[in-house]
Every structure is written in C-alpha cells, then in structure tokens.
Amino acid sequence: MTALRERREAVVREHMESENEHDFDTTLATFGHPRYEIIPTGDVHDGPEAVMAYFTESRTAFPDQRNELVSLRHSDDAVIVEFDLKGTHRGPLRGFEPTGREFTCRMLAIFEFAGDRIVCERVYFDRATILEQLMAGD
C-alpha cells in the first residue's frame, strides 16, 4: 500500500470513529471541504455549517447512532467503505415521531479525496430497510 493510501485509510477510520464518538469537530477536520451527499434522500450538505446541521438532525433522531466497519477498499481517488449503521429512534425525524425502535442497515460510502483530505462523502443505502424496522408493527 502506498503512503497516500495509508494516510487516506487512516483519515477515513478517524472520520468514522469520531462520528461514533460524536466528536464532530474532529469529523469536520478530516475534510478538505465538508460535503455529504445522501443519495437515497437526495440531500446534499455542503460546507461546515450544513454538515454540522446534518449531524445535529441525525443524532437528535438517533442519539446512539453508530457505524461498524465491514470492509474497506481503495481506488485512485477514493476509499470505498461498506459498513453497518445502527441506532435507536429516540427523537423526531422529518415529521416522524420517535418509535423507540432500533435499526441496522448495511450501507456503502464513497469517500472522495483531494490529496489526503476528504472532499465528499457519498452515501448509498436502502431507505426501506430502515423504515421497515422503525415502523414494524404500525
């Protein structure tokens, strides 16, 4: 593995772990320019304020939200990560009142890089997987 790939992998691991710890200043510091693209919802959070608002919204709804790394691969300009996202619906989310139910969803994130800094995290997942678990029995 090249030195650049090693550094990028370390940055992605720091990014993901800081999200688990809700240390969002550290998460933001892994970006050259903070940008999240949530493909299933069409949401784009561009810039530090927008990304921090995303963290606030998602962790209000799922205060125990965490990721568990499944696999990690490198490309020329990105690190591709497969992970399980888990959480408990304890706060409101886009008009949905908390259900108290847990979810687990396999996800894929493409971390695009410029040098050794993330410039975009693009996330893919199946929304129905989460909704079915949160709305089970309703």
Whereabouts are the PLM-identified features?
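C-terminal and inter-domain tail/linker signature
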Residues: 1-138
